[in-house]
Amino acid sequence: RGPAADGRIKPDIGAKGTNVNSTVPTNSYGLKTGTSMSCPGIAGIMGQLYQGYKELNSGVNPSSALMKGVLLNSADDLGNPGPDFKHGWGEVNAYQAIKILENNQYFNSTISQAGNNTHSITVPLGIIQLNVMVYWHDIEGSVNAAPALVNDIDINLTNANGLTAYPW
């Protein structure tokens, strides 16, 4: 459970880790539980996402920030709405993650301190829920420092009528 010592949200994401069919000693299979079961699942999904991105983008390697952002934004929310210190962004959803890549539903850009970026997206009629995320590598704070974000980046969404929505 989180948060990290410097206040960052941890864990990032979860995966099935209870009663997972796995190998056991004596060349057999059995049910196992714990992060030793969920972590390989996340690693395998990330490997597939990297491969999928490269196939969709002429062999170009994606940034790790993009891949993590796609993974987190496609997760199925658990617990309290939004990210929390028990479930992170939720349970991994590999299908939704690859759909984000296949449909090119992401931006890759940079922003500086006190900067401002604007991106326009068209939301098709009938969409009931829209998940939008800004992701960056937020490095750890200094040891023994008070919890504080190293980079404080905010997002807001404004529709065609000028109505602005803020996260949480």
What is each residue range found by the language model?
Residues 1-23, 72-76, 131-140:
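Catalytic-core segments of hydrolase enzymes
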Residues 9, 16, 67, 151-153:
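Residues that flank catalytic or metal-binding motifs in active/ligand-binding sites
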Residues 9-11, 63-66, 127-130:
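Loop/turn elements at helix/coil->beta-strand transitions in domains of secreted/extracellular proteins
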Residues 14-81:
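Hydrolase catalytic cores
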Residues 30-31, 83, 156-168:
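Noncatalytic accessory or regulatory domains flanking protease catalytic cores in secreted, cell-surface
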Residues 41-42, 62, 151-161:
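C-terminal, active-site-flanking charged/polar segments
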Residues 66-103:
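Secreted, periplasmic, or luminal enzymes acting at the cell surface/secretory milieu
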Residues 89-151, 159:
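Secreted peptidase-domain scaffold signal
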